[in-house]
A protein has these predicted regions:
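Conserved active-site neighborhood of enzyme catalytic/cofactor-binding cores
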Residues: 74
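Nucleic-acid endonuclease domains
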Residues: 1-60, 67, 77-254
């Protein structure tokens, strides 16, 4: 099964839009909960679709891995207004395929937390295939370390990379206040509840970064690139909305 043949993304997206439109609110568990409240909201949507999945853990990727379909869903909640142009991806580069699973991302924006307010709405959301964020599926992140730093040579230096990735809200225009589904163009949607609202293209760069150096004396970083064997390749995507809910507002690259 490939993304071009079948996916649960349609059902999950439509359930997310139904819940958002009908006012199913995000429940904040505690004042210190800054990560899992939107994930819990998405989990309830997956449950409503009667899809079986492995329980998420703090270090699992993607967050929700379906049992009966080779798919996974990574959830990213964003306070609005706030930081919404990009997000921190700790030790994991976004991808459209991970360990044989098609990967989809669920981005949701919600109001900033206020004292005494423990529930709030989903302002807007985007469900997109991971290849819309990054087309490469071969890179494998690894944490590395070495010992020998410091006056006595016994300090360990860990290289634990943090990737800062643009969100769909920054990459495309026409998503504010609505729910949008972005899929590879070769996928044929099956639900008559979905209406196409845009065609999007992302073009691979001429040169790709392959390594970097960090000078511990000057605190300067030097990057190294090489020609991209896929330079100029255009990746085509289509954007969809629920019929009758913002389907006259087009989605375009920003």
């Amino acid at each position: 099964m490939t993304i071009a043949e079948s996916t649960a993304a349609e059902a999950i997206f439509l359930e997310c839009e139904r819940a958002r439109a009908e006012g199913d609110l995000i429940q904040r568990v505690s004042a210190s909960d800054k990560e899992y409240h939107f994930q819990n909201w998405v989990e309830a949507r997956i449950q409503a679709c009667t899809l079986d999945y492995d329980e998420p853990g703090r270090n699992t990727y993607p967050d929700f891995r379906l049992v009966n379909q080779p798919e996974g869903y990574e959830v990213k909640g964003l306070e609005f207004p706030g930081r919404e142009a990009d997000y921190d991806s700790n030790s994991q580069v976004p991808t459209g395929n991970h360990n044989g699973r098609e990967v989809f991302y669920v981005f949701g924006r919600y109001p900033k937390a206020e004292r005494g307010v423990n529930e709030y709405p989903v302002v807007d959301l985007v469900v997109c295939h991971g290849s819309f964020l990054n087309a490469d599926t071969e890179y494998v992140h690894k944490n590395k370390s070495f010992r020998g730093f410091g006056s006595y040579g016994d300090i360990l230096v860990r290289d634990r990379k943090m990737y800062v990735v643009p969100t769909p809200f920054a990459l495309v225009a026409g998503t504010a206040g609505l729910a949008t589904l972005i899929l590879p163009a070769d996928y044929k949607v099956r639900s008559d509840q979905l209406v196409e609202v845009g065609q999007l293209e992302r073009v691979e760069v001429d040169d790709v970064l392959v390594s970097y150096e960090f000078n511990l004396q000057t605190n300067e970083m030097l990057t190294h690139k090489k020609p991209n064997p896929n330079a100029g390749i255009v990746h085509h995507f289509r954007a969809y909305r629920s019929r009758g809910v913002g389907d006259s507002k087009l989605v375009t690259l920003a």
